[in-house]
Structure formats: C-alpha cells, structure tokens
C-alpha cells in the first residue's frame, strides 16, 4: 500500500497503515527500529484516544500510555466514580484497547438503555467469557426478545407465589442462626450466604444439595472478583478471571444436573412446580400439550436443553447475588439505625396479620405491607446496588447532537445520579420512606432506574420487592437488630455492587413479636 492509498482510508485505518509503512521503511539498527515502533504505537494510542474523546469530559491525554487508569480500576472507589459523573453528562477514559464512555444524566442513561439498534449489554468486558458467548443475555435483536419473553412466566404473580414457602423456610433458618450468634459480627459475608441460599433454593428447589449450596456460596465471590469493570484483555491461568470462569463452569454443571432432575419430576412424574426450574419446564410442557396460540406460549414449545437452562439460571444468580447482598446490607443497616422506622414496620406486620405473628407469608399478605415495601424501595433509591450498566456500541451511536460514540466502545449509563436528582426527590441524600406514599410520575417512571429500562429491564424486579418486603417484615418483627457503628459505616465500598466499608457489624437478639412496641 502506498501513501496515496493510505490517504483514502478512514482516520484510524490511516494510523494503522502509517505504522505499517513506517516499520516497512525503517532503516538503521534494530534498536532504532524498536524505538521507532514504540514511538509510533504510543502516538497511535494517544491520537486514537483524542479522536474518540472528541469534546466530552475526560483526561486531556492518557497519562499512562496504553494501560490508562488500569491500576485504579483494580481498586474502584465510589468517590472517583462520583467525580467522573459530576464532570459532565458525558465523560470518558481509555484502558488498554477499550475506550469507555460514561453517561451520567437521566435522559442519556435512558436513551442508551433504550437503544438496542446501537448498543447491546456486555456487563463487563470479560463477562462474555465467564458467562459463555452462548448465554441468552448476549443475544441481540429478535433472538433476545423472544428468549426473554419465554422467561416472563417465571416471574408472574402465579409463579412468585410458588417460591414463597421455600424462601420463608430459609428465612426462618437463618434468622434463628443470626440470633444464636454470640455478640456482633460482620454481616457482609452472612448476607451473601443467606441470599445465595435463598436464590439457589428458589431456582433449583430440592434438586441442589446443602453441600452444593455451601460450595457455590463459598466460591461465588471469585466470580464477582473476576468481573471488574476493566480486566486484562486475556484470561491468564490462576488469575481472578481464570478462577471466576472455573467457578462459573462448575456451578453451571451443577445446574445442568438439577435441570435434568426437574425435567424428570415434571415430565415423567407429572409433579407440581416448586421452584423456578420446575415452573420453566412445566410451562414448556403446558405449551406443547395445549398447542397454545398465545405468542409467549409458542416460544416455549421448543425444548430448552439442560445446558441452556443452566446458563439462564446462572444469569439469574449472577443478576441477583451481588445486588441482593448489597440491598440486604444497606437495608438492615439503615433500619437498625432508625427506631422510628422499626416501630412502624412492627406495627404494620401485626396489623396485616391480625395480631397473629405466626401467619405464614403469601403474596397477598406481602402486598398489604405498604410501609415495609416503601422502606425497601427507599433503600433501593438511597443506596442503589447497581451504579451503572455497561454496554458495547454495535455501530457509531449519535448519543448527543455533538458527540457520536465509536463502534466497539464501551458505553455506560449510570443509575445513581437519576435516583439522587433533587428536582425529583426532595432531600435526595436523606432516607425518607414516606416519600413513596404520594410518589410523582417521575419518581416511579423516568427517574426510577434501579432495575434499568428498555428491552433489558430486570426480569426479577417484582421478585426482589416481594422477597425483601417479606424478609424485612419477618426479621424486624421477630428480632432486635443492634448496629455497631464505625467511622466507615456510611462510607461506600465498591465490589461489583456497593456495600458499607466496614462490612456491616450487626448483633441480633430474638424478641417476642407481641411485646409492646
């Protein structure tokens, strides 16, 4: 290729071709050639960053050539994220080969989340390797829409009612354990174990053993640790990403075996559904037998393989484990620190149960817990577990009139600023459950980005509110929670989602639910 031909290429291809031409024509010693190549690579890296950055906020130059702020990304800090959001509605960084655009305003976040023509989820850069490229979350267009519609029945009101008994059983087991602990302890790991057990029993029922639950609960943190926002481009043996992929593969193998047992229970033994796997297989069976003309049922006529089921169930665990653990930590810390809220929850719990604390949970009962539900919603707004949702740009994306995100860039809509918008939420940095009693449209709709929006909005949003409303009510009614505050209690630690920096030091004591409030 000669210089005239190079001039006719797009700019970034010109840069690449320029390097090739320079190397081909380089003369002199090997050392001179080497330094020439290094200089050209570094120049290309900086120029590429400048072209991609355009007019949006971000460092003027890549201070650390090639790697960018990679070392900072290994230890993410909430304060640094917030500074980036405050720097402009669009900002950027560049790490290794990946150019990252961050959108901090509500409207831009909604635009990105609702633009499947231009973007698709990538979770984080390495997620496709850990969750597998065949996983349904990475499907695009009609394939994704159809697959997602086939899962809607797993989170219908009818299905949610099925899951409550096993959830309540494990709530009781863990609450009794918490109350037997001698003195205060860190509850970040305790809540991770509790939520993992609740999720696995909800998803897999009795097909998964106690030993397997313990194994997944003990090891799952390696998956979380592997899914940093930006990783080294390849998986290196015995690194965090390598261990994360191994644990993910081992867990999905357990789920495959559970799916096989669920198929036998539903298809061969005509059993009734008791967990998510049962309900999915039951819906497939029902669709085949009835030859339903309902569009959603038609999608279930085909037989989903055990592998497909295992991958989908793993995404449910992936989506729920860290976010629900985060919600549990903040929710119980916040409530334990506010005796007025505790009193209101206890009053409501006895009222909806007609003063019988032994009444078991049901969907109708949970739906009556208006105040308790408002406390959960306010916790999700005040300390949203998920700060941002990474996407990859499929083709040049005109995000604003003045900026187009380049193909291949990672683009990240952030959720936190919309949930702390003072124009929508009065005193946004205060915890006020009562704000939800007369909520405005924007509070519920345009700014309520806790579960995302658009084609990838969280499937389990009603499941989350049901689970935590029921659990908060039971735990507060039947126990006293003592929060041992430290200077770090209100500081935010980022570990995939967000947690109190001191890992939440709690002490539990059993109480008579009928005693005076």
Swiss-Prot record:
Catalytic reaction annotation: 5-dehydroepisterol + NADPH + O2 + H(+) = ergosta-5,7,22,24(28)-tetraen-3beta-ol + NADP(+) + 2 H2O
GO MF annotation list: C-22 sterol desaturase (NADPH) activity; heme binding; iron ion binding; monooxygenase activity; oxidoreductase activity
Subcellular location(s) per record: Endoplasmic reticulum membrane
The entry's keywords: Endoplasmic reticulum, Heme, Iron, Lipid biosynthesis, Lipid metabolism, Membrane, Metal-binding, Monooxygenase, Oxidoreductase, Steroid biosynthesis, Steroid metabolism, Sterol biosynthesis, Sterol metabolism, Transmembrane, Transmembrane helix
Regions that span the bilayer: 21-41
Source species: Candida albicans (strain SC5314 / ATCC MYA-2876) (Yeast)
Membrane topology type: Single-pass membrane protein
Residues engaged in binding heme: 458
Enzyme kind, highest EC tier: oxidoreductase
Lineage: Eukaryota, Fungi, Dikarya, Ascomycota, Saccharomycotina
Principal location: endoplasmic reticulum
Stated role: The third module or late pathway involves the ergosterol synthesis itself through consecutive reactions that mainly occur in the endoplasmic reticulum (ER) membrane. Firstly, the squalene synthase ERG9 catalyzes the condensation of 2 farnesyl pyrophosphate moieties to form squalene, which is the precursor of all steroids.
InterPro entries given in the database record: Cyt_P450 (IPR001128), Cyt_P450_CS (IPR017972), Cyt_P450_E_grp-IV (IPR002403), Cyt_P450_sf (IPR036396)
GO cellular component: endoplasmic reticulum; endoplasmic reticulum membrane; plasma membrane
Keyword Iron in annotation: yes
Name listed for the protein in its UniProt record: C-22 sterol desaturase ERG5
An annotated GO BP: filamentous growth
EC number: 1.14.19.41
Pathway listed: Steroid metabolism; ergosterol biosynthesis; ergosterol from zymosterol: step 4/5
Cofactor: heme
């Amino acid at each position: 290729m000669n210089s005239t031909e190079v001039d006719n290429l797009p700019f970034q291809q010109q840069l690449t071709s320029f390097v090739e031409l320079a190397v081909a024509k380089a003369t002199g010693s090997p050392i001179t050639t080497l330094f020439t190549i290094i200089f050209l690579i570094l120049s290309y890296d900086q120029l590429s960053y400048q072209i991609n950055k355009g007019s949006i906020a971000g460092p003027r130059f890549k201070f650390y050539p090639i790697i960018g702020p990679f070392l900072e990304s290994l230890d993410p800090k909430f304060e640094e994220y917030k500074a980036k959001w405050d720097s402009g509605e669009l900002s950027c960084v560049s790490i290794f080969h990946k150019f990252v655009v961050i959108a901090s305003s509500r409207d831009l976040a909604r635009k990105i989340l609702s633009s499947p023509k231009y973007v698709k989820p990538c979770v984080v850069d390495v997620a496709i390797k850990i969750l597998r490229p065949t996983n349904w979350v990475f499907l695009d267009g009609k394939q994704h829409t159809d697959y997602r519609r086939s899962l809607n029945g797993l989170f219908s009101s009818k299905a949610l009612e099925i899951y409550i008994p096993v959830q309540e059983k494990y709530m009781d087991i863990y609450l009794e354990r918490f109350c037997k602990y001698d003195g205060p302890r860190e509850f970040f790991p305790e809540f991770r174990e509790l939520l993992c057990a609740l999720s696995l029993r909800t998803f897999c029922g009795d097909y998964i053993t106690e030993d397997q639950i313990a194994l997944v609960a003990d090891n799952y943190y390696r998956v979380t640790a592997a899914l940093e926002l930006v990783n080294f481009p390849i998986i290196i043996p015995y690194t965090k990403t390598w261990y994360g992929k191994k644990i993910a593969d081992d867990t999905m193998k357990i789920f495959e075996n559970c799916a096989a047992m669920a198929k036998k229970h539903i298809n061969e033994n005509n059993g009734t559904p008791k967990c998510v796997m049962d309900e999915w297989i039951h819906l497939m069976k029902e669709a085949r037998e009835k030859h339903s003309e309902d569009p959603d049922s038609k999608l279930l006529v085909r037989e989903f393989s055990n592998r497909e089921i295992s991958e989908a169930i793993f995404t449910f665990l992936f989506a729920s484990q860290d976010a629900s653990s985060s919600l549990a930590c903040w929710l119980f810390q916040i409530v334990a620190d506010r005796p007025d809220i505790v009193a209101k929850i206890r009053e409501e719990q006895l009222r909806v149960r007609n003063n019988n604390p032994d009444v078991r949970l049901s969907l109708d009962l949970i739906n009556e817990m208006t105040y308790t539900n408002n406390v959960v919603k306010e916790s999700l707004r005040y300390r949203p577990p998920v700060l941002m949702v990474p996407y990859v740009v499929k083709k040049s994306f005109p995000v604003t009139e003045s900026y187009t995100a380049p193909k291949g860039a990672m683009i990240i809509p952030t959720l936190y600023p919309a949930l702390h918008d003072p124009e929508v939420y009065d005193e946004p940095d205060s915890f006020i459950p009562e704000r939800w009693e007369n909520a405005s449209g924007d509070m519920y709709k345009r700014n309520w980005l806790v579960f995302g929006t658009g084609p990838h909005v969280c499937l389990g949003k009603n499941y989350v509110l049901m689970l935590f409303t029921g659990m908060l009510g039971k735990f507060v009614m039947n126990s006293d929670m003592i929060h041992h505050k430290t200077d770090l209690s209100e500081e935010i630690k980022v570990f995939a989602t967000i947690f109190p920096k001191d890992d939440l030091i709690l002490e539990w004591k059993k109480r008579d639910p009928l005693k005076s409030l």
